[in-house]
């Protein structure tokens, strides 16, 4: 005999009577659920062992970069060490979940269909939750494969060129466990880790190389000056080492 239950009709706002479990209802099998997760993840990982571009860091810059690369036909994989994608944008400014963009940034918001409001001449605001969740969704739908909870702990170097990433679970790194990593090959690697420049820092620390910068090393960051920082970011978002 079926079990009667009441449910809420979201579309019409009515409480309706329906049927619950019947003898014909599929019984969930925990083993199949586990097999599905393992098989699908294995397929996804195996398909991304060799890519055109590997992005390290899933904040807004990494997401937008990977989105445009994928839209232009490149095979792109993004690795984020944390559980959630989006970097610090979720919190807006000091946990006030609003962001401010200029006219150039608004064009990107418009392309992603993220709503914004004019606040002052040249200053637009947007809800940070809408902004970053939309960036995440549209980046995945553009064809980018995202792996969270994975850290890039080293680089593959061949003949003075970066040719891939050395990867491990973030949990392994946090627990200081001695677990050997795995690798992927990539024609290009993008360091989108923000202030820390983690990928370039590894490159500089472990190899006797000279970067394509003023000093040949990581220049580093300075105290806050928004106008200068925006210009420097635009000028210095470029290749700093082959690959």
What are the language-model segments listed below?
Residues 2-52:
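Extreme N-terminal leader/targeting segments of oxidoreductases
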Residues 51-77:
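N-terminal Rossmann-like FAD-binding beta1-loop-alpha1 element of flavoenzymes
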Residues 61, 84, 196:
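Conserved Rossmann-like nucleotide-cofactor binding loop
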Residues 70-90:
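Glycine-rich FAD pyrophosphate-binding loop
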Residues 91-115:
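N-terminal glycine-rich dinucleotide-binding loop that anchors FAD/FMN and/or NAD(P) in oxidoreductases
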Residues 116-188, 192:
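Feature captures the FAD/FMN-dependent oxidoreductase FAD-binding
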Residues 191-207:
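Flavin (primarily FAD) binding-site architecture
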Residues 202, 206-243:
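Flavin-dependent oxidoreductases
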């Amino acid at each position: 005999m079926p079990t009667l239950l009441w449910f809420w009709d979201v579309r019409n706002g009515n409480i309706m009577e329906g049927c619950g479990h019947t003898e014909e209802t599929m019984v969930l099998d925990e083993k199949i659920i586990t097999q599905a997760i393992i098989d699908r993840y294995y397929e996804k990982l195996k398909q991304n062992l060799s890519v055109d571009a590997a992005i390290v860091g899933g904040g807004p810059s990494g997401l937008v970069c990977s989105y445009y690369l994928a839209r232009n036909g490149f095979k792109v994989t993004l690795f984020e060490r944390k559980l959630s994608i989006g970097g610090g944008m979720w919190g807006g400014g000091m946990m006030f979940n609003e962001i401010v963009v200029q006219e150039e940034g608004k064009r990107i918001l418009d392309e992603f269909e993220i709503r914004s409001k004019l606040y002052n001449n040249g200053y637009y605001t947007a809800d940070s939750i809408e902004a970053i969740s939309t960036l995440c969704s549209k980046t995945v739908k553009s064809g980018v494969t995202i792996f969270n909870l994975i850290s890039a702990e080293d680089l593959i170097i061949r003949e003075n060129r970066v040719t891939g990433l050395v990867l491990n679970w973030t949990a392994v790194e946090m627990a200081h466990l001695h677990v050997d990593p795995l690798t992927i090959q990539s024609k290009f690697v993008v360091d989108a880790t923000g202030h820390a420049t983690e990928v370039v820092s590894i490159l500089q620390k472990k190899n006797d190389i000279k970067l394509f910068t003023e000093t040949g090393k990581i220049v580093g960051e300075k105290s806050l000056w928004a106008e200068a920082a925006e210009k420097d970011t635009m000028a210095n978002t470029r290749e700093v080492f082959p690959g």
